[in-house]
A protein has these predicted regions:
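Hydrophobic beta-strand-centered segment that forms part of the acyl-chain substrate-binding groove
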Residues: 37-72, 76-79
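HotDog/MaoC-like acyl-thioester-processing domains
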Residues: 1-3, 65-67, 78-132
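Hot-dog-fold acyl-thioester-processing enzymes
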Residues: 1-55, 109-132
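Hydrophobic residues positioned within well-ordered beta-strands of beta-sheet architectures
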Residues: 6, 54-56, 71-73, 87, ...
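Intrinsically disordered, low-complexity segments enriched in small/polar residues
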Residues: 24-27, 58, 83, 87
Length: 132
């Protein structure tokens, strides 16, 4: 599996005064997709070790409006380093149009310093590593 796909639903409270999903809500969608991806690759210890986000970026391609239809989020791992890994996300609206692209870098962390990625997590991440 090189791409993990999940769906999230918008809530009316996600909207800004213009009727668009507010930019900060995208981070919630990405967090949900990230956790689901890690759980899907059978890394059950996902919530049992410390990770910190070192980087997060979002490129907004088109507004997301309210709909009861789900958004589709595709998640890939683009690189796995010694202490960190990079995830890429693509959010599609209900018409299949690309609404946003995002990237995050997660760092394994313990006692105020970066630590090597646990072997079990490394293997799980490599199962959805996207080879360019």
């Amino acid at each position: 599996m090189s791409v993990f796909v999940t769906q999230v639903y918008r809530r009316f409270s996600d909207l800004d005064p213009l009727g668009h999903v507010n930019n900060v809500v995208y981070l919630d969608y990405l967090q949900e997709a990230r956790l689901r991806a890690l759980m899907q690759i059978d890394y059950a210890d996902t919530l049992k070790f410390s990770q910190v986000m070192a980087h997060q970026s979002i490129e907004f391609r088109r507004p997301i409006l309210y709909s009861t239809d789900p958004l589709t989020i595709k998640v890939t791992i683009s690189s796995v380093g010694k202490t960190s890994y990079r995830m890429k996300y693509r959010i599609f609206n209900e018409l299949g149009e690309l609404a946003a692209e995002a990237e995050s870098v997660m760092v394994c962390f313990d006692n105020d310093k970066a630590v090597p990625i646990p072997d079990k997590l490394r293997s799980a991440l490599q199962s959805i590593l996207e080879v360019e």
